[in-house]
Amino acid sequence: MRKETPPPLVPPAAREWNLPPNAPACMERQLEAARYRSDGALLLGASSLSGRCWAGSLWLFKDPCAAPNEGFCSAGVQTEAGVADLTWVGERGILVASDSGAVELWELDENETLIVSKFCKYEHDDIVSTVSVLSSGTQAVSGSKDICIKVWDLAQQVVLNSYRAHAAQVTCVAASPHKDSVFLSCSEDNRILLWDTRRPKPASQIGCSAPGYLPTSLAWHPQQSEVFVFGDENGTVSLVDTKSTSCVLSSAVHSQCVTGLVFSPHSVPFLASLSEDCSLAVLDSSLSELFRSQAHRDFVRDATWSPLNHSLLTTVGWDHQVVHHIVPTEPLPAPGPASVTE
């Protein structure tokens, strides 16, 4: 197990300050979400959770090492309210879950210096806490504190279905990367539901959450279509097989609530686990710890794996830090005799 944290990547000294048009002058303190694009560009979502107004913003950095310095972003835009969650839609679309109760779709212009609004729909009655794009890329699912889950047609900008299968606010939804009609949801009603929108009764309960500990985060295994992981408010991470609806593995990873789970794109994927205990843990397929970082000084809110460097994992948190971690992808060598360099 590796516990030391490498220093953050240092941006090059020679870089020109050039705030793009329409970008806000200042980024909000709390960083809520981060997503790499396939070319390595980094998208950030920020929120201000103090003061009289809960503002938010979106930022694109072609050079991730420059984040979160506003003057080195490629594009930025102010949002009406805080950004609770976001995800890429293709290479230029950005789907946002807003504190205002709206689901928003933004798009980069051709030069990628402007982020323009495509739609902003107030279909939820409370904060939209989570969004996920279905594998087809044309539909998405949103979950809210209003207890509702909604399936969207992004091209038509309409809600296709609205469900109230949970009895408390929805904390996470996760679209299957393998099947375009399947997704997961979890809620403060202590239930995890498996959805298939092709069925007359689309939701079925996965009876694997621990009594008394609410599930908070979900992630599908990138290669095994019937397997997913979830984290709970107690800091435990569990691996579930939907065929047996039982926990295959479970591990007490954190001392506080799990805030996010993100699989790597490796051939043998690693799992990044984030928590309100301000730590990041990287786990192997048996949920054993490979790497841990406590570089953040507040809640760690999101993580994203670089598509260009499989060792690079980037995290963001409420301390306004963007931390770049180098995670060992090969087993560490056994300690040998010390060598002397002349």
Swiss-Prot record:
Subcellular location, principal = nucleus
Entry-linked PANTHER family: METHYLOSOME PROTEIN 50, METHYLOSOME PROTEIN WDR77
Give the gene that encodes this protein: WDR77
Name the chain's protein.
Answer: Methylosome protein WDR77
Assembly notes: Component of the methylosome complex composed of PRMT5, WDR77 and CLNS1A. Found in a complex composed of PRMT5, WDR77 and RIOK1. RIOK1 and CLNS1A bound directly to PRMT5 at the same binding site, in a mutually exclusive manner, which allows the recruitment of distinct methylation substrates, such as nucleolin/NCL and Sm proteins, respectively. Found in a complex with the component of the methylosome, PRMT5, CLNS1A, WDR77, PRMT1 and ERH. Directly interacts with PRMT5, as well as with several Sm proteins, including SNRPB and SNRPD2 and, more weakly, SNRPD3 and SNRPE.
Localization per Swiss-Prot or TrEMBL: Nucleus; Cytoplasm
Q: Which Pfam families would you find in this protein's record?
A: WD40 (PF00400)
Post-translational modification Phosphothreonine, affected residues: 5
GO cellular component, alphabetical, reads:
cytoplasm; cytosol; methylosome; nucleus
Q: Where are the WD repeats?
A: 22-75, 78-116, 123-162, 165-205, 209-250, 253-293, 295-330
Query: Which keywords belong to this entry?
Result: Cytoplasm, Nucleus, Phosphoprotein, Repeat, WD repeat
An example of a GO molecular function for this protein is:
methyl-CpG binding
